[in-house]
Amino acid sequence: MESNYSGVVNGYDVSFLPTSIPDLGFGVPSSSDFDLRMDQYYHQPSIWVPDQDHHFSPPADEIDSENTLLKYVNQLLMEESLAEKQSIFYDSLALRQTEEMLQQVISDSQTQSSIPNNSITTSSSSNSGDYSNSSNSSVRIENEVLFDNKHLGDSGVVSFPGSNMLRGGEQFGQPANEILVRSMFSDAESVLQFKRGLEEASKFLPNTDQWIFNLEPEMERVVPVKVEEGWSAISKTRKNHHEREEEEDDLEEARRRSKQFAVNEEDGKLTEMFDKVLLLDGECDPQIIEDGENGSSKALVKKGRAKKKSRAVDFRTLLTLCAQSVSAGDKITADDLLRQIRKQCSPVGDASQRLAHFFANALEARLEGSTGTMIQSYYDSISSKKRTAAQILKSYSVFLSASPFMTLIYFFSNKMILDAAKDASVLHIVDFGILYGFQWPMFIQHLSKSNPGLRKLRITGIEIPQHGLRPTERIQDTGRRLTEYCKRFGVPFEYNAIASKNWETIKMEEFKIRPNEVLAVNAVLRFKNLRDVIPGEEDCPRDGFLKLIRDMNPNVFLSSTVNGSFNAPFFTTRFKEALFHYSALFDLFGATLSKENPERIHFEGEFYGREVMNVIACEGVDRVERPETYKQWQVRMIRAGFKQKPVEAELVQLFREKMKKWGYHKDFVLDEDSNWFLQGWKGRILFSSSCWVPS
């Protein structure tokens, strides 16, 4: 296409426009030869003609609001040939009037097959002196296209005053009037082509109800349009120009208000969800327990017995043999065993099938990802997903309804902290691994009633930085939510966020410990993620972490650990221990939750599946799941300078009564051993909690 266009188009003067094409997102190359700013003429393309010396720059918000329309127009310009279809520059009013004229010509004169060239009256002004052929020349539009049916007599003469179009290129040597009339009025075939062109052009345009963008359904309005003849419609449009702008402003304001209402409604639902899951009822019981699915465990057992038993598969033996083959480097045998496991396992089957599915994934990743690329890419894809607190809370609520583990861990920790701070005026809690802060709403609720003399609650939340440009975003959001709860219950609050990858390297001044405050250190189920000693290091990071807590000299130190022994350096031993541990967890869910529960599927995949992948497929510093038994941690803590507070037998008995009241499964185990509060499933201890003070 020629780069230099000059001439007259529809009465518009665009000499004031800039000489570069805006980037509309369709890859249109910039050019200084022509510029069609269609967004400036969207509201009234054939009504307002600016002065020649007027420089117009539309507001940025107006351009943004019509960005979708610009994309449609730009796509049309990219796909159509401007040299072959010159009428693309004409406005909709001229097109509509041309249609009416064609209908009248066809109906009045069937004998007249073409319009003589000499019956067309043209008048041009400034034919040669107003334009130049340079690449920086502007296009001056001085044409007025008017159709008045009363001028169409028997002769069918049409008058186009001042109508030289795009003159200046060699291929546009004839006046635009003659080209237009010959192509449109030559014979009846041209009429059919014209209608066919309309049908083709309509494919590029959106539906009628899509011209109002980003409006909610309740905000849509039906605007009646009355078609008038001649200049009356144009005059009415010009008269109501400001009224339409005011109406559009009202629509935009109403849309903003509706969005604010929607956001407030979502916040209200999210707050209600947090309250239901994290707060206590009038009897100091978790509200989520009442609506949980644990009460249906008996029905699930009966339903399972009623079904016809499927052929039993010994997944444990198959998985163990496959792990031994992987460890020995026997890829052929391992692949054969994996195929047998894949035929029977399923992420939505029973407990053993789900367990086999995730362990088979981990074994396959270890077998195929000898260089670590496949393993780490999978692990990063899971860990780097940005999961909102609401998404985690849904899965967390299912875990609470299925098992009492987290509820009793929080109850134990909160009671020990409240006992230590019963007369405190300022309580400072340092929470290692605060994450979303699910532990603290119920604590704040109870603190507001048990200690009316408390002047301030301070919480220092410590967490591993998340991926991205804002590593502290998650823990800052946690602080904001806790602030809202403190305002709600009337507890003065101060929050401090620390993001650190290696917790043993945090400086003492970062905790902002002040004199005359009760200091409580809390670490719930995060010891398993601490780095262990690796070859080449003299000091163990786990011992360094405990030494840091001892240097803080807390009034009370609460620790809850995952009781597992799959931190061994030997793969086969680690695999067997992990298989025993996660078999109990999957069996727990199978006995208390239905197979089709979507939150159960999400929780098993996002948490247990990721942990299994890390334990089995990763090695070295990439393996971050390294749990130890509670007796191993007891030795470490005593060596670090702590002494253990005894667990009251009355407290364990109270927890047993609570668990029976809440309707949990009878196979859950609560016990006390060596001043540790233990929880498990069917005799296997899974979690342990204890309270420590400096010796």
Swiss-Prot record:
Residues 105-136, 234-260 are annotated as: Disordered. Keywords: Coiled coil, Nucleus, Transcription, Transcription regulation. Residues 617-693 are annotated as: SAW. Expressed in seedlings, roots, cotyledons, leaves and sepals. Residues 396-461 are annotated as: VHIID. One of its GO terms (molecular function) is transcription cis-regulatory region binding. A motif (VHIID) lies at residues 427-431. Residues 313-377 are annotated as: Leucine repeat I (LRI). Residues 233-266 form a coiled coil. Residues 477-509 are annotated as: Leucine repeat II (LRII). Residues 306-693 form the GRAS domain. Its main location: nucleus. Residues 113-136 have a biased composition (Low complexity). The keyword Transcription regulation applies. Residues 519-614 are annotated as: PFYRE. GO terms for cellular component: nucleus. It is found in: Nucleus. Probable transcription factor involved in plant development. Belongs to the GRAS family. This is Scarecrow-like protein 31.
